């Protein structure tokens, strides 16, 4: 069973390159301080790693 992670957008995508913006959008994050909960699959964790300078990640039980 994969762990769940809560991802919060804490920095704006203004001034970021287009691939970074698309990655943030594909994670389901739209506005600043928006949060989503996702399964901690390798695909999701790879996307989080690519935008780690913009998001905060918390592991859920």
From Swiss-Prot:
It comes from the Bacteria. GO terms for biological process: translation. Keywords: Ribonucleoprotein, Ribosomal protein. PROSITE patterns: RIBOSOMAL_L30. One of its GO terms (molecular function) is structural constituent of ribosome. It holds the Pfam family Ribosomal_L30. The keyword Nuclease does not apply. GO terms for cellular component: cytosolic large ribosomal subunit. Part of the 50S ribosomal subunit. Belongs to the universal ribosomal protein uL30 family. This is Large ribosomal subunit protein uL30. It comes from Treponema pallidum subsp. pallidum (strain SS14).
């Amino acid at each position: 069973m994969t762990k769940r992670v809560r991802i919060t957008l804490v920095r704006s995508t203004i001034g970021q390159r287009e691939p970074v913006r698309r990655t943030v959008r594909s994670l389901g994050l739209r506005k600043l301080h928006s949060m989503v909960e996702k399964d901690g699959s390798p695909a999701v964790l790879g996307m989080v790693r690519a935008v780690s300078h913009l998001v905060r990640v918390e592991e859920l039980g």
